[in-house]
């Protein structure tokens, strides 16, 4: 049967993958309320389409930190992709490059920055956690720079790992044939099996709980790469991020895997956008499964979106071809949404093209 939308890959991945692996990718924190809400909140935003506009030519191109991409749909960092498919991050990198968009490589990838760079040309960002051993951080950043990565996406919502109960039940550990490639030779490559979630105990020992805004400034002393602060959900933190020198913000709740009962990212987006006053770009990840979702995020002020789970699920189902198809389906749906809303370019997508539950009722138009 032909796959006609992004969500269908979820069920295929669930069939194909070992339970421990599928659950690791699919689950959220605790009650998983935010996990559902990331999707549900999109469904409560409705369109106000404009009609009788010539939409014979639609331009979806945009620039992110000065890099031109084919569409405002990018690949978010997701860990350990070789658990999904033997080609892992290699396949994702090639698919993103073929789609003319940006891939963000996770620190906890099962392929190294050098290996991903070797797949060929492409605009790539590197996701970073700050470790207690700052020397490790410096080495990772240097390697990403040397491998031609163009920006650092600094994850700031993980001073501790969220409680993902399925990982505890499954005693999640990295399968024995795989390793966290960026840490090879740093004595951090292999995770031990633990009676809790193996990842939790591994990370608990490595991630620095003292991480603060001064570390964002420290990072700028060791690299010239632009820094995206990933995990901002409030206007207050958006303003501080700008003061701290961030080149951009990613509104993210870590795929609902950290603190449960935070709002959906699409619900938090507008507050963050308003706080930044256009000084730096704001991006969003979390819950994007349709081209309509992409349009809604842009209408609320996002400069682009990132997708995570759809990438690993399509990777599990069909390898590189699956990831290519997900990016193509979202592109096609987004283009159709633009046409049916009367928008010919991204700059024509406005707040007036949508209505949200927190909008005040509009005065009725007088003839």
Swiss-Prot record:
Residues binding glyoxylate: 24, 129, 164, 254, 257
Show the SUPFAM superfamilies listed in the entry.
FMN-linked oxidoreductases
Positions binding FMN in this chain are: 77-79, 106, 127-129, 155, 230, 252, 285-289, 308-309
Name the coenzymes or cofactors required: FMN
Give GO terms: molecular function aspect only. (S)-2-hydroxy-acid oxidase activity; FMN binding; mRNA binding
Key word Oxidoreductase present: yes
| N-acetylmethionine: residues carrying this PTM | 1
Family matches, as InterPro entries? Aldolase_TIM, Alpha-hydoxy_acid_DH_FMN, FMN-dep_DH, FMN_HAD, FMN_hydac_DH_AS
Predominant place of localization: other
Q: Name one GO cellular component term.
A: chloroplast stroma
Identify the EC number(s).
1.1.3.15
| Pathway(s) | Photosynthesis; photorespiration; glycine from 2-phosphoglycolate: step 2/3
Q: Tell me the Gene Ontology biological-process terms attached to this UniProt entry.
A: defense response to bacterium; hydrogen peroxide biosynthetic process; oxidative photosynthetic carbon pathway
Q: Quote the catalytic residue positions.
A: 254 (proton acceptor)
As for subcellular location, the record says: Peroxisome
> Which Pfam families does the protein's record reference?
FMN_dh
Q: Which family does it belong to?
A: Belongs to the FMN-dependent alpha-hydroxy acid dehydrogenase family.
- PANTHER family in the cross-refs: 2-HYDROXYACID OXIDASE 1 (PTHR10578:SF107), S -2-HYDROXY-ACID OXIDASE-RELATED (PTHR10578)
Subunit composition?
Answer: Homotetramer.
**Its job:** Catalyzes the oxidation of glycolate to glyoxylate, with a reduction of O2 to H2O2. Is a key enzyme in photorespiration in green plants.
**Protein name per UniProt:** Glycolate oxidase 1
Give the originating organism. Answer: Arabidopsis thaliana (Mouse-ear cress)
